[in-house]
A protein has these predicted regions:
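Conserved H-loop
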Residues: 93, 201, 205-208
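Helical hairpin unit composed of two closely spaced alpha helices linked by a short loop
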Residues: 163-201
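Cytosolic-facing regulatory segments adjacent to core modules
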Residues: 41-46, 76-160, 175, 253, ...
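The Walker A/P-loop phosphate-binding site
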Residues: 3-109, 312, 317, 339, ...
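Flexible beta-alpha connector loops of hexameric P-loop NTPases
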Residues: 114-120, 142, 174-186, 217-229
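C-terminal regions of RecA-like/P-loop NTPase motor modules
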Residues: 5-19, 29, 108, 114, ...
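Hydrophobic/aromatic beta-strand patches that form the interior of the parallel beta-sheet core
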Residues: 56-58, 87-89, 144, 204, ...
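Helical mechanochemical/support elements of P-loop NTPase systems and associated helical scaffolds
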Residues: 69, 94-98, 123-126, 149-152, ...
Length: 345
């Protein structure tokens, strides 16, 4: 090539910003030859892949076990990866209630007994062992408290040095906007979460889903009828996520057997897993091992950019999406108004 080499990031007088293929190729090809894959955090199950730069969305019906599943996955993540920190942003359950789930799972003591603190001598050894295990990682877990908005998520993640953020659940969180329509709010929320991921954080998003028709034509939350279109409020949820999964009973008459349907995998294979949900001790386990193990993770980087700064950048660079009425008004303004506009319509 005879042209002068251009810098990787180009900002022209017109305001266009881009990366040239020529300048990008050398760094990318070096990375290909190095053989180091993406950073992935091992957790309780072979899939989904969770790591810096990835937004993983898990939907599910009420009482399907979304929170229990995400808590088990998050806790095992900090146990397997002693270098990472976890931030749990749960707007419906207290830290004590969430840790009760973990205590029940790790000790094998009935969750009802744990909740009511009904312990006997027969529980002593298991209780002591579980508490000792929790003590080894609890200093790397933080629980965000109200307000449940995206600014607080960013500020808390920065303050705690979180490497993984769990949002539970997205439809209940607010953004710095006057936009009160749920669909637009969720759209913007996904914009922010994608920026967080780009800053080097792993983001796990829990979402509500809507009912669908089962094979018998009934309105149901059974896994057979749920799809990417089932995520509530916004199509931006399935578009914005790297991986999208739905946790639902295989048969509504047998809620103990659930399916984690892998509906979207932007970077790799889709692996649907059937699980046994033991509600007595708040624990999920694989019914059959996954056919293919995920790739060996690379060494995780330890630093990232400020998430609060990412919010400021995104907020200053774009306005909230206009609602349908505003778009219609704008269209009429561009094409004229009054009698002529009415005749044109």
């Amino acid at each position: 090539m005879t042209r002068d080499r251009q810098p990787p990031f180009v900002s022209s007088a017109s305001g266009a910003r881009f990366i040239t293929g020529e300048s990008f190729f050398a760094e990318w090809s070096d990375n290909v030859h190095s053989g180091s894959g993406p950073v992935l955090y091992r957790h309780a199950f072979p899939f989904p892949e969770i790591g810096p730069g990835l937004v993983t969305m898990i939907g599910g019906a009420p009482a399907a076990g979304k929170t229990t599943f995400s808590m088990q996955m998050g806790v095992e993540m900090v146990r397997f990866n002693p270098e990472i920190r976890l931030l749990i942003c749960n707007c419906e359950m207290t830290p004590a209630a969430l840790m009760d789930k973990t205590l029940s799972r790790l000790s094998g003591i009935d969750a009802h007994d744990v909740r009511h603190r009904r312990f006997g001598e027969e529980h002593a050894d298991r209780l002591a062992a579980a508490l000792a295990t929790i003590e080894t990682f609890v200093d790397r877990i933080a629980f965000m408290t109200a307000p449940f908005d995206i600014r607080n998520v960013a500020a808390t993640a920065d303050a705690t040095g979180a490497d993984v953020i769990v949002i539970d659940y997205i439809q209940r969180f607010t953004i710095p906007s006057d936009d009160s329509e749920a669909r637009h709010r969720v759209n913007r929320m996904m914009d922010y979460l994608r920026r967080f991921a780009s800053a080097g954080v792993a983001v796990v998003v829990i979402s509500a889903v809507g009912r669908s028709r089962d094979r018998a034509g009934r309105s149901s939350y059974a896994s057979e009828g749920l799809s990417l279109a089932s995520f509530r409020e916004s199509s931006e949820l399935e578009f914005g996520a790297d991986d999208a999964l739905i946790l639902a009973p295989v048969d509504v008459d047998d809620p103990e057997v659930v399916r984690l349907a892998h509906l979207k995998a932007r970077h790799g294979m889709q692996v649907t897993q059937d699980l046994m949900f033991d509600r007595r001790v708040q624990s999920f386990s694989l019914i059959d091992p996954a056919p293919v193990a995920p790739s060996t993770p690379a060494v995780a980087p330890r630093r990232r950019t400020s998430l609060a700064a990412e919010i400021r950048l995104l907020w200053e660079s774009s306005a909230p999406a206009a609602d349908d009425a505003s778009r219609e008004a704008g269209s009429q303004s561009r094409h004229g108004d009054g009698d002529d506009a009415g005749e044109a319509q």
